[in-house]
């Protein structure tokens, strides 16, 4: 897989951030974009946390950006949008090609209750990559159960932080996504369901 021209950090959980510590082995220079709004839980922004943690890596250049305001990255238009991943601030992402109009939306790590303003930015993607950590049936094993139930009582959020498979598919419908792939899937999917469509698998590529 070719190395990226830039990076975007959506939140500061280790599985979305700590790999930057190896950037010096791979890059001469890596611009990293992240939100500039202060998180009440940490008293600093995502961009601020990235800059503080990796201030010793001159090859990482942090570029703060304001949520819900489009910015240019690698010739594309990107917009960070607030989502629901308590207790920390977290962001989804919409990326559009200004020449073709092709659009990719990423839910980011989130519960089903994505704010309306963020949904408006994410809406109508050609491809939607949606957080779908487990099937809704596994919510009974979470200490907090499930949340954001659909009219049939199916939980669309696992605990408080991630969407269930069913929640991710409902959000895709809400956004009128042309194609949806489910990502951030845990290893707790039953073997009989682990490779069912539309769960993404390593190595997939997409043309928009």
Q: How would you name each of these model-derived features?
A:
Residues 1-107, 111-120, 178, 191-208:
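Binuclear metal-dependent hydrolase catalytic cores
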Residues 114-207:
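Cap/insert and terminal regions of metallo-dependent hydrolase folds
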